[in-house]
Amino acid sequence: MNRMMLFLILSIVVISGADALPKFATRQGAKCQSCHINPTGKGMRSTFGSTYGREELTMTTYKETTDIEEYSPMLNDFFTVGMDYRTLFYYREQNSTSSFFQMQGDLYLDLRLNKKFRIYFDKGLYSGFEVFGLAKVLPLEGYIKLGNFIPSYGLKMDDHNLLIRSGAFFPINPAIASYPGGLGFGQGAEDTGLELGFSPAFLTINVGVFNGKKGGLAGTGGTKNKAIVVRADANVQTDLVNFNVGGSVYNQPNAGSPGKTQIFGGFGVISLNNNLTLQGEYDYLTTYNSVLNKEVTGSILYGELNYLLTSGVDLKLGYEFYDPNLDRKDGSISRFTVGAEIFPLTGVEVRPLYRINQEKPTELNNNELHIMFHFYL
């Protein structure tokens, strides 16, 4: 709880003294559905999101000589394509090894059947996919989404190594290996179900019902219980400050495999002068632990400060903390991240990150250097 108070104090300091990713949407005073075809964010960018990425994110140095005039990913009035391609170079201090890893190669297809209904498809290099029908036919700018997709929970960050998403790709602390590595909402977390969404004024509300299992053939087995996901947030824009605040609940009561899972938490993003952004999330996670043979509750804290140094250069400072069992001192993880997001050319991002990992009860020398190369359409 002391870490939670520290995070709140940091938020107040930033608000008082400071002159997409969720941070990009909040900087513009926009909602996730303004930037993406998927109303809950992630994946193919909308016309607004694509224009923002081309006009606002990129360095101005080579923009005039490299940009394509009147560029559009729309093949015609009803068919649009998109793509995200990420290659990661990483270095691990623990064993002094390095490697290249093809993180992502997602192809997006958006097919409009009529003015109200569209089919969306997202297929990556590895297992997992998203495909759904989206009908914008409900009142209050509402929609119905049916298919296989990642449930809408918390901040939908693109870094799946964050503890509030899938968790670290390489296990950080062996002492807590029997606990979940993160919340589990990263790549490969697709589930089949139905989602309803509403966006009255400055509010956004999403309610989903899912099988509670991984999508595809593996998730078709019938169950009596279904997973319920609820997410709501408020988006407020002023002349000086834009902020977004909300909360999420995920409840999967299935007593069998994969076991009971209950997650709830709050999140927020605040942007000042369109260049200083603080975002954070705090969650409680309850799961069944097969080693202890009982349910356990842990907590995850995430905070990140971003500063737009100049057009195309975003500096990052992040902190994460994970205690998987609040009733026992089995171990914990603290992680500090320093880095930047650099957009040298339109559709090109380079993201160097250095992560300092701290473990309890035994400290390991396992810091990491990540350099991610991202090409997007």
Spans of model-derived segments:
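The canonical Cys-X-X-Cys-His
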Residues: 29-39
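Outer-membrane beta-barrel "beta-signal"
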Residues: 31, 342-343, 365-377
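Outer membrane beta-barrel
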Residues: 43-44, 75-91, 95-215, 224-229, ...
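Gram-negative outer-membrane beta-barrel proteins
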Residues: 43, 89-95, 129, 152-156, ...
